[in-house]
Structure formats: C-alpha cells, structure tokens
Amino acid sequence: MTKRFYLIAVALLIFSGADSATPFIPLQGNVTSYRMKTLEGKKISLRDYRGSPLLINFWATWCAPCRKEFPIIKEIEKKFGKDGLVVLAVNVDDTRTISGVKSFVSAHSLKFTIPLDPNRKLFNSFHGTSLPLTLLIDASGNVIRTYSGFLGAWEEDINRELSELVTNASSKKAE
C-alpha cells in the first residue's frame, strides 16, 4: 500500500507541470542557418527571415498540449502578423507520418509556414527537451525568450514581448 502511494505521488509530481509553460533565461547568440523543408516541400532557412521578428513553435501531432495551444498561436499570428511577425510551426513528427501532419494542418486551418524537423536537429540546437517549445526571436535573429510547455499560462507575457518585438523591428526598418 505504501509503495503504491509513493508511486502515485511521484506520478502526480511529474505530470503536474506537463500542461504549463516555463519561461527560460534567454539563450545567447544568433539563430542557426540550418536549412529544412516545409510541409509543401519548399527549402527554407531561419536566415531567410532576418529583419522580421519570429515566433517558432516546435510541435507534434501526438502532443496534446501542442494541439491545445494552436488557437493561441493562430490568434497571435492574426494580431501581430500584420505588423511583421512571422510564425513558424516546426513539426517534429517522423517523416513516415507526413500524411497525418498534412491532415492535421488542413483540419485545423493552419495558415502559417510548417517547416519539418523530423530528426529534431533544429529542436536540439535550441536545447529542446520537451514539446511544445516556443521561441521568440528578434528581427536580428537573437533568441529573446524560450517557453517550454503549454503557452496558455504565459499568453499575457508573450503578447507584451511580441508587441515590443514588432515595435522594435518597425522602428529599425524606418531608420
């Protein structure tokens, strides 16, 4: 009985934070020039987006918190996309499930660019350990903030940070 209690207690501790985001100390340095293909087969690099603030979200079709936060990301793109924010929803599913990814994107009317990172090279370059993982990157390519887990708890912070990022990007373009 005691052993069962401890197992349940440990399981509760492990999974209690599974649906919340943890802000990390901003990573140092510039984003990688790693190239990848989009869901449509177009080759892109993060370097292609220099001059624009980015929200990069790593996700998978099997990840419940990832699916849960797409309405938030769609709303963010709707709000800040007109001001230059680019949303990249980087899928880390295995290439064998690409048809499932396409079905998911279609069913959820996701309009932003969906790069594919099936070997998790880009994900690992950002020290990713769990999904979803969201990064805010300034127009110069510097990682400003990293969120691990469901974004709902940090929506207000993200909106404030994105507002600053698009304002700073606009003022730099005007100079």
Q: Across the structure, where does each feature detected by a protein language model lie?
A:
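Conserved redox-active cysteine motifs that mediate thiol-disulfide chemistry
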Residues: 50, 58-75
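N-terminal "domain-start" segment that seeds a small globular fold
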Residues: 19-46
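Alpha/beta-hydrolase fold active-site loops
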Residues: 53-54, 85, 132, 142
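Thiol-/selenol-based redox modules, centered on thioredoxin-like
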Residues: 136-175
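Short hydrophobic alpha-helix segments
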Residues: 47, 126, 145-147
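Sec-dependent N-terminal signal peptides
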Residues: 5-14
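Structural microenvironment flanking redox-active thiols in thiol-disulfide oxidoreductases
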Residues: 67-108, 118-125
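Short, internal strand/loop/helix patches
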Residues: 31, 102-140
